[in-house]
Each structure stands twice: as structure tokens, then as C-alpha cells.
């Protein structure tokens, strides 16, 4: 929403050489600033005590003991409730997703509603004649024993696969479009912005969004679209944290405490999605809270929520194997120093993947906004049909991505040369015919290229969509293809561990698309338990990060989406060239000198009128408080600053009718205690910030930026010799910073408009051919 200054007839100060940042509101880098409310972290810290003090005083006699007990237990009750709900939703998502995916290939003989894991839970191993916990790659025994019925025939399985894929995608996109539009996409970018101090639309973390995201996400994944659940898991987990804290801590919730709960919940979302609790905690530190100080309190809350959430998930046991990890992989053959060049090559691939896939995805998002925004449902149906049609004939694309990676990560032969896996990938040796080798190698390469392209066009469609697992799937097929070449032409069989190459490739692409390092390393270890490959993994991730850094990419896909969508976000410090440019400008040039001010003494009726008039006309969000004796002066002295939301809350607490409001005086410089029992007088001193952050006119913009980032304030007063000159807001300085970047370096993202028009012409021609008859009428 607009900044806190508005034009009035009598501006304060001369306003010479002021840069009007509002004229740049419509540039892409700032297009959605008005959808966010800047949070004044300093002012928010005092809100609960000041606004609720009267109510607390009146009720303290009756609620004292209950409140003491609640005060001691509320943190753990809130954290535990949040974690348990997140764990339950994660268990539901896993079971529901697997059920829908399995329906595309068969059904349970005794109960159609059971997925393959539950249906085959009691399968008897023909070798040991014992009932084992089902392992992903032992499911063929379930079919052999008649517990699971696969679709038979040559055409029927294909038709069922296609129909269910399109149906699942259709239901998912309809739910998002017509019921909860905020449930679309990943949600990580918006959460990062929210945590950094810019509050988004309340519906984004609302109950309806939580429900639809939890239902539409498994439908989208089951449709076969190249989307993952990890990003949306962060979103639904954050919804849980937000809703439960608002409900349980509504009387004492401040921004800083809410930030801690939201960060902890987001980390738990990653923890339950990957089965990686420590990785989830690190994700909250490295990704979500990167623009904020991650203190020990936040770290502890993140740890506790991840612990309880993952314990809840283990109790539910959605995989029916007693574990919470996606892949049960063990590598007992150590790596060799001679393999380091190959590890470096995998890291280079991960860096290039992150660079180009994010770039192409951003270009396609621009194309979608320009030409496809009116047909979101049709776009999803087309993508689902295309994906299913291509994937059906390739094993590594047809399978669910996590199941496919389970195959690719698996170790074929142990150190004693005994086979642990019967997949055809493990039947290749020096005696394998070249045609068979090329068939599997080509299948892996095809899956790599097609999956990467599908990620480009699928991420951002009108369904819940993550990009972590699809990127890992691309890296896994590439890494396994590389291992085939190494075994065939360099090392020979039984020397390297092919599954480890898939594992390292997945880590490379995950790091490439997210630009995360420590988080990726820990998540990959928790996913697989492959601790023997810690050094190769660190090499791969380091090389990936080096490639991204040398390419000028400083953030992952979430950070780039923030810029693409024009969200406000206080980025890390600017480079030297940008800092030198900003040093030339001062607060005087950036500030707004046209303000609405409030005198320290004012009638309640005037205050109400000013409050609601500003709401309708200007959407002002704060007011400087000035001395009474300066009421008719051009130069005013500022004694404080009050947020509009605090002012509205305080006025609502007053039991004053409209007639009495005309004679009731409000004192911003006195409290009710100071006024005593004076009739028709109210003290508002408790909601006024008596020491707002202020600077001189000559302060450089670079210093202002650091103040906003480190202090977390919403506005900074510009004064000179005690005289109020203007205001600078966080959005002002962000607009200015991005404007100057655009002037010096050009647009952050450039698009080939001519190519977009040609592509749209082709698409439009095809659509027209299939939707009109010979007479030109729509079919």
C-alpha cells in the first residue's frame, strides 16, 4: 500500500530537489509493493501492553492464576500444537498422494482405497517366507501374490493413466482458481517477504488457503506435473503456525514472536516433506530468515517444532516401513580420489542448471502473464496432458519422482559383489550389448532433458507447485547417466557406486536452483544416510555455488521470484558500484515533505474524522505528532509518531458517544495516570512512540538503507535543528534502490518480446484450428 505521506495544501518544508519515487510505482521491480504492509518492528513491540493494559487491569482480579499458568505453558503448547498439526497434514499428504499415484497403474485387490504401501504391508517374501516391511523395490512380490492388481492390456492402462492425470490436474487447478487463489505456487517468496517485515494479504496464511493447499497439492503431484511438495509444504506449515499463534497467543503476540513461530513452522514444513528435521531447521536459518537476525530463541523453536512434527509423522508411518526418510539407501563402497573431476563436473552441471532453468522459467512466467493469464485452467490441462503423454513411455518420467529417485540412488552391488537390487540399471556390465546400454543411457538423458523443460513450464502454473524435488529428479537422472559412461569407458564395473552419482547429481541441481549450501548437504544426508560421501557432496555443492557466484547470481529461485513479482524485500548489502551510486543521494532528496500531522492535543471527534478521512482518501498508515504551539506554523517540531492501527485500536476501546467526542480532548503527551480524574480528557501517550528514529537531511541513502535493514523500522523522521522536514519509509528506499539499479544496469530481467509474440502466434493458430470449423464458427 502507499507510503505514509500524502499531498495536502500546506506542505511541511520546501521540498526542493525531492525525488518522487511514486512515479516509478508501475515498473516491474516495484509493481506489487502496494499489496504489502510494512511492519514497524520497533513500534509493534509495545503494542500488546499498551493497547490491552486497561482490559488486563480490569480482569486481573479474576484471571490472575489462570494467566500465570498459561503464561508459563503457552510457548510449549503453541509449538507442540503447531508441530502436531503439521505432522498430521504431512502424513495425510503422503498417503493421499501415493494413493492417487497408484490408482494410475492399478488398485488394491481387497480395498480400492488402499495405496500400494498399505495394501502390500503384509506381503510374504518368497525367499525368507516371512512378512517384511514393504520396501519400495519389493512391490513386484505384492503383484505376484495377487494383493495388488495392475491394469492389464495394451491400451487400457494408457487410457486410465492419461484420464486420471488430466482429472487430478483439473480438480487441483479448479480448487485453486475458484476457492483459494492464494494457494497457488510455492509460497516461499511471499513468506520470506513477510518474515522480513512486509505483511502480505491475510488470506495468504488463512484457513481456507491451508485447506485447499493441503488438498490441491497431492492432486497436482499425482497428475504427473513436474512439481514438488516441498515448497507448498513450507506454505501450509506456515499457515498452521500463523493461525495457531493468532488463536492461542492473540493477546500477547508481537511481530518478533510471530516471526519466530512462522520461521519455526516453515522449517518444520521442510522437515516433514523431506524427512529431514535438522535440514528443516537450517532451511529456516539459511532461506526463510536470511533477511532477519536468527537468534537462539528462533533456533530453539525451530528445533522443537521440527522434532515434534517429524515424531508425529513417524507415528503415522505413511510409508509403512517404520521410517520417515524418502530413500533408504546405504553405500558401503568408498569413493576414490580419482573421481573428484567427475564430482566437479556434476557440480558444474548443477550450477548451469540453476542458472538457465531459473532464467528460462522467469521468461516463461513473463510469457504466461502476457498471453496465458486468461486461461489458467486450460494451461494446466494442456501441461498435464503433454506431461502424461510424454512420461508414459519413459520409466523414469512415468514413475512418481520420489520413487524414480529411489531407483536411481540405489546401490547395485555391495562390496562382496552380492546384488541387492534387481532393476535393469543393475544388469549392465562389460558383456552388455551396446544397444541395450544405449537404450538405458538414452532413456536417462531423455528424462533429464524433458524433466528440465517441464520444470520450466510447470513451475508457476495455477496449482500448488514446488521446484525442489523436480530439480533433484533432473540431477538424479543426469548423475546416473554419467555413472553409466564412467563404468562403460573408464572404470569398468564394480569399481564406482553408480547410485552415488545420482545422489550427487540431485544435490547439485537442488543447490543450483535454491542457491543453498549447508541446508542442501544436511538434507541430502538425512534423506539417504549416505555419510560416506560427505566430502564428494561438499565438493559438488561448493562447485555449484562457485558457478552461480561467477555468473552473478546471488539468490535462489525464491529470491528471483521476489524481484520478478516486484515484492518489497530488504536485500543484502549492495555491491561497491551500487553503493557509490547511492552515496551521491541524501535523505533530503528521498524524503516526502508533504505530511498529515496531528497536534499533541486534539478533540476526539477531530481525531476520528482525520482517521477515517485518511483511510478513505489517502490510506495513511502513521502520523507525526507535533507541538500545539506550532499548529499554525509552517515549521513544526515533532514530539513523536503514532501508527494508524494503534490509534484505531485505542479509539475503539473508548466508550464515548459522538456528542461527547466533540468535547473530549485527547492528549498525546500525557497518560491517563498523569491526567488523573480530569473530565473529558483521555491520554494516548502509551501508543505514541516518543523517540522515533530520526536523521539529518544530509544523511546518505546507503546509511538509511542499513538503518531500515538492521533496526526494522517502518519510517524514519527527517529533522533539521529539531524541525520536522519529512519522512522516509522502507518502501521509499526500496523503490529508489531498484530505480537506480534499473538506470545504471538496465532492467533486472530482459525478455525477448519478438520471440514471445511468434510463439503466441503459433499457439493461437493451433488453438484456432482445433476450436473452429470450416465456416469459422467456434466448435
UniProtKB/Swiss-Prot annotation:
What membrane topology does the UniProt entry give? Multi-pass membrane protein
In its keyword annotation, does this UniProt entry include Transmembrane helix?
A: yes
The residues annotated as site (Mediates proton transfer from the outer aqueous phase to the interior of the protein) are: 230
Query: Any ranges marked Cytoplasmic in the topology annotation, and which?
Result: 1-75, 176-177, 225-264, 320-336, 391-436, 487-500, 553-779
- Name one process (GO BP) from the record: regulation of iron ion transport
Give the function comment from the record: Anion/proton exchange transporter involved in iron and copper cation homeostasis. Involved in intracellular iron metabolism during growth on fermentable and non fermentable carbon sources. Required for proper copper-loading and maturation of multicopper oxidase FET3. Important for adjusting intracellular compartment pH to more alkaline pH under iron limitation. May also transport chloride ions through the plasma membrane.
In which family does this protein belong, per the annotation? Belongs to the chloride channel (TC 2.A.49) family.
Q: What is this protein called?
A: Anion/proton exchange transporter GEF1
Q: Which organism is it from?
A: Saccharomyces cerevisiae (strain ATCC 204508 / S288c) (Baker's yeast)
